[in-house]
């Protein structure tokens, strides 16, 4: 009886050991647990675990639970089994041309107008010779493996106390931006004065007139209750935030090739799914909620004038050549 008990315990212990994942990735992002992205990251993690039969486990941490983005990226460079949701502006700090993807009107310069065309354009960008070269440099020189950048968060517009229809309307306005040089140069090129303010401080900044407005998505503005401190939403659609999902190239190379493929495939799939949902459904829903709060939407914007003005940002940042090369490779122009 005792031998049987010992044998049973041994079988249970061995079974537990074999059931444990061989590879674990801790994935960090700064968004709240209620955001569509968090749900999409969880879906990606579940799909990977199922397809690898439990060999690969991705643990998702929302609200920057593992730390601030800058610290996590440095740990990733050092080879830690971590992942981070970031953007091309941040990756452009290592390989400058990659930052082109988060400059004003990038996706428009790629010829994309509909959500479907946005995803198609990004797929072509990923397959372009230039992007492959830049991604290889990120991976081999700086230790960042980009799993996917088919993750977009919707178009950003200007939310202010006055209507914005052309670049001249932004003259003298202090517009809140993230502290990224690429972002700030974009807003400066469009005619405004960029002011770096933390996301959580935007409401107070506009309320106290430390800033005259912000450039955000409808979802950002609604969730932050900014409809209480602005009057107009001017639909410039100047930036479509393209997110990069990155992990350590050292960790990624430790995986069997078939697992590498699964992780990338499922990351692309989850990203496209949530991006389409945001662009086709959620953005419009938040816009309608915004209107219900009494905010005036300005849709008759001179987009051509804004796109022309935006070119100065590419020139100032020294990446106009990168933009023109991608236009040639993606659009054949």
Q: Which residues does each predicted region cover?
A:
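N-terminal secretory/targeting leader peptides
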Residues: 19-120, 137-333
């Amino acid at each position: 009886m005792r031998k049987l008990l010992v044998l049973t315990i041994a079988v249970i212990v061995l079974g537990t050991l074999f059931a444990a994942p061989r590879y674990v990735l801790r994935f960090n992002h700064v968004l709240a647990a209620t955001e569509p992205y968090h749900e999409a990251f969880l879906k990606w993690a579940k799909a990977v675990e199922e397809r690898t039969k439990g060999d690969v486990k991705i643990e998702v941490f929302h609200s920057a639970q593992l730390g601030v983005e800058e610290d996590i990226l440095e740990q990733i460079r050092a080879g830690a089994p971590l992942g981070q949701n970031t953007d091309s502006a941040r990756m452009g700090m290592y390989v400058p041309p990659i930052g082109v993807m988060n400059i004003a009107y990038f996706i428009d310069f790629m010829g994309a107008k509909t959500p479907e065309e946005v995803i198609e354009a990004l797929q072509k960008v990923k397959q372009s010779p230039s992007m492959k070269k830049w991604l290889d440099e990120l991976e081999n020189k700086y230790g960042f493996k980009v799993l996917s950048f088919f993750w977009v968060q919707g178009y950003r517009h200007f939310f202010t106390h006055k209507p914005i229809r052309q670049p001249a309307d932004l003259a003298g306005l202090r517009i809140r931006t993230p502290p990224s040089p690429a972002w700030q140069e974009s807003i400066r090129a469009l005619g405004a004065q960029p002011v770096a303010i933390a996301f959580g401080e935007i409401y107070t900044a506009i309320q106290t007139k430390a800033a005259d407005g912000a450039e955000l998505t409808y979802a950002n503005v609604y969730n932050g209750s900014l409809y209480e401190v602005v009057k107009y939403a001017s639909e410039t659609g100047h930036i479509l935030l393209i997110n990069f999902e990155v992990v350590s190239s050292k960790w990624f190379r430790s995986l069997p090739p078939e697992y590498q493929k699964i992780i990338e495939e499922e990351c692309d799939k989850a990203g496209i799914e949530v991006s389409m949902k945001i662009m086709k459904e959620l953005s419009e829903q938040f816009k309608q909620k915004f209107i219900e709060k009494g905010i005036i939407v300005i849709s008759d914007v001179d987009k051509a004038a804004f796109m022309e003005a935006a070119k100065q940002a590419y020139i100032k940042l020294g990446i106009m050549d990168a933009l023109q090369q991608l236009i040639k490779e993606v659009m054949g122009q």
